[in-house]
Regions:
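Hydrophobic alpha-helical bundle signature of multipass membrane enzymes
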Residues: 1-74, 87-94, 99-107, 112
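Membrane-embedded catalytic cores of phosphoryl/pyrophosphoryl-handling enzymes
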Residues: 70-152
Length: 152
């Protein structure tokens, strides 16, 4: 249940944080960065998943047992659950700038990742890959200098 069940609370915390904690005058900029960070991480994950696939079978398939959580019919690298939950955690951290909610999201994200491994739907490499690839989107949260008219 942990492997799948905590995704919804993480998403709800993310929605709350981004809707209620981001100042109105910053919403457009924050939402644009969150969108770009998520898209960047997702596209990077799909490209890396096509280029590098450490195993063609998931752990439960190798062991010949039933999966302990939901999964897509693909080899599993990187973990979409890890990618999605970490992307939300980063959005709460950088977008809403609420370290308490981000810490709660991070703890739940780690539980989701451990749960995915315990449920035998991912290897540790799959979930670590998802976590790290989600961090690729951080580039959109870094301060960006607007070009001066003299630079154009």
């Amino acid at each position: 249940m942990i492997a799948d069940g905590l995704v919804v609370p993480i998403a709800l915390i993310g929605i709350y944080a981004l809707l209620k904690l981001v100042p109105n005058d910053k919403k457009y900029q924050v939402y644009a960065r969150v969108l770009m960070a998520g898209l960047t991480a997702y596209v990077a994950a799909k490209i890396i998943g096509v280029i590098y696939q450490p195993d063609q079978m998931r752990p439960f398939e190798v062991l010949g047992v039933a999966a302990g959580a939901s999964f897509l019919n693909n080899p599993g690298f990187p973990s979409d659950h890890a990618l999605f939950t970490m992307a939300i955690t980063l959005a709460v951290w950088f977008g809403a700038k609420d370290w308490r909610l981000a810490s709660i999201c991070l703890a739940m994200t780690i539980m989701v990742c451990v749960g995915r491994v315990i449920a035998l739907v991912h290897t540790p490499l799959d979930v670590v890959g998802g976590l790290l690839i989600a961090c690729v989107g951080i580039v959109w949260y870094l301060p960006m200098k607007r070009p001066e008219k003299s630079d154009i």
